[in-house]
Each structure stands twice: as C-alpha cells, then as structure tokens.
C-alpha cells in the first residue's frame, strides 16, 4: 500500500509539473480588431493575474521574449504587436489613422477581444502613452503599472526631443524627411547598445526591428507617429492627474543611461504616486536586452506585495 501511495504521489507530481510546463510555454496567436489582424504572444496560466506588455519603437512583442518565460510561472502574460509593428498587419494609411490615440483604441479593443477584465501593465517607450490612455479610460481594470523607460513627464525627455518639438511646431515636408533617420539601421543599433555593458546586447533584436520597419509602407507610418508623438506630450498633465486620482501601484524600472527618456522621468513618478517604487539598472533604452533577469525579479517582488488584494 505504501508503495502504491508513493507511486500515486509521484505520478501526481509529474502531472502537475507537466501542466505547469505547458502553461509556461510561449504561444503565438492572432486576433481580428477592426480591419487589422493583431499578432500577440501569450504565456502563463490564464487563471493567474494578468500582465499586459506593451512594446516600444521600433520594436515588437519580440522584445519580451526573455522576460515572459521568467514571469510565466506566477503570471498570465499577453504581449500584442501594434498595427504596423512586428507581425501585426499594416492597414493602408488612406483608410487607417496612425495616431497614438487610434493605436490605443486598437489595444483597448484587443484586450476586450481576448477577455482581459483586470490586468497589470508593463509599458515601455511608445507603449507607455498607449497604456496610460487605457488606464485613463478604464481605471477600474488596472491592477498595477510597471513603467520601464515609459515616460509621462516633461523633465523625462532627453535632449533629442528639442529638435522634435521644433518639428511639431513647424511640420514641413523637409523636416519630416529628416526624421527618417530615426529608423535607420545605425540609429536602431544605437538605441539598443548605447549605455549598455559592452558585449551584453546581441544583434537579434535590432536586426529584427530593422527588418520589420523596412516592410512596404511602414516608413511613412513611422513618420506619421513621430509627428503624432506631440499628442502624448500634450496629454502628460492628464496622465499625471490619473496617477494622483487613482494611486495605482507603480514600479518604475529605468535603464539609467537612456538618452531618450532620462532618469528624471522615473523620479518624477514619486511626485504623483508617493508610494511608487523607483529602481535603476546600469543599462540603456532597451534595458531588457541586458538586464531581463534583474527586471523580472523586481517585477516579482513588486507584484507579490501589490496584486494579492487587487485581483
């Protein structure tokens, strides 16, 4: 009898481990939203707390390829590609408005289509103003915010933004063409490698980003979004008001050497959410490329103390 019980316990343990492994496997799916087929990655058990991961420029959900497996044991993770990014379709500009507000509406409808009713958000770069819009529209759905170089403060804008602000005031065709350098290969490589420990960033991420941005029609779409980024800066006061009003649990983890969104942007969260956690890692803009393990631990520690009463 003891031997039978031992064998039964062993089998149950094996089944449990198999189920856990299956839940932790990365899955790749698509969902139709308006006239756009949205690609997304998913990992973890849907019965566990959900984290929606929103990528930046010029990347895709591929940027979360290392982070998601590290979190999948404790959380359900979903990471969509925005329209005209990564594997998601690029509807024609004549029939689809490429603005941050519209991208946020698409992501909003996507979350409803895949059944997300409450979720934490990991927001980065372009994904930040998209995610902050979702939070303003549906504050009751947001259980926590993890901002990784995801700015909402004027003081968080690095020097490079001065030229863009001048362009926003006077958006001529000539200036529009100048900003095509933002998605040149050498610029994308610089975004990944500047400020990171030497030899810590492989070529996979920036090579794939460059491939995606070179797809037909995407260059002009990126030009549209570079101009429309001014709408995000205009909404900074509203984003900040949301924080002051709802006081969501907030973790800011910043690559401290990022020239685009500088450390002052992380520190400023304390002004609106006094209990916000602020951490810096010795990396650049794409901090996950070199510090995904450290960032995963910060996220686990943070959510362990915030989600137990929020979901």
Where are these regions (language model features)?
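C-terminal alpha-helix
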Residues: 298-306
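Bacterial Sec-dependent N-terminal signal peptides
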Residues: 1-22, 311
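Flexible "cap/lid" subdomain of the alpha/beta-hydrolase fold that forms the substrate-access gate
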Residues: 23-38, 43-46, 50, 78, ...
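Structural cue for short, hydrophobic secondary-structure segments
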Residues: 53-56, 79
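Active-site glycine-rich loops that stabilize anionic/oxyanionic intermediates
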Residues: 56-59, 125
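Catalytic histidine-centered segment of alpha/beta-hydrolase-like enzymes
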Residues: 284-296
């Amino acid at each position: 009898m003891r031997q039978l019980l031992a064998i039964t316990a062993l089998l149950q343990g094996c089944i449990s481990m198999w189920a856990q492994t299956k839940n932790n496997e990365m899955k790749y799916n698509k969902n139709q939203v308006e006239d756009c087929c949205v690609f997304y990655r998913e990992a973890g058990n849907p019965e566990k707390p959900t984290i929606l991961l929103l990528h930046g420029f010029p990347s895709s959900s591929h940027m979360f390829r290392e982070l998601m497996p590290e979190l999948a044991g404790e959380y359900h993770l979903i990471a969509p590609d925005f329209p005209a990014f990564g594997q998601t379709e690029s509807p024609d500009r004549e029939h689809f408005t490429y603005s941050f507000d519209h991208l946020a509406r698409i992501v909003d409808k996507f979350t409803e289509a895949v059944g997300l009713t409450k979720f934490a958000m990991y927001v980065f770069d372009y994904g930040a103003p998209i995610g902050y819009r979702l939070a303003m529209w549906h504050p009751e759905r947001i259980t926590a915010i993890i901002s990784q170089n995801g700015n909402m403060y004027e003081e968080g804008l690095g020097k490079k933004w001065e030229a863009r602000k001048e362009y926003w005031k006077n958006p001529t065709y000539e200036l529009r063409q100048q900003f095509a350098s933002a998605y040149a290969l050498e610029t994308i490589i610089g975004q990944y490698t500047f400020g990171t420990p030497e030899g810590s960033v492989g070529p996979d991420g920036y090579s794939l980003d460059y491939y995606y941005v070179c797809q037909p029609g995407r260059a002009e779409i990126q030009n549209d979004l570079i101009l429309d980024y001014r709408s995000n800066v205009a909404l900074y006061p509203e984003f900040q008001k949301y924080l002051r009003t709802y006081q969501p649990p907030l973790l800011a983890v910043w690559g401290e050497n990022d020239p685009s969104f500088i450390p002052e942007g992380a520190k400023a969260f304390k002004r609106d959410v006094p209990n916000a956690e602020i951490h810096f890692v010795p990396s650049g803009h794409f901090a996950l490329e070199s510090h995904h393990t450290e960032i995963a631990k910060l996220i686990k520690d943070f959510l362990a103390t915030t989600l137990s009463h929020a979901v």
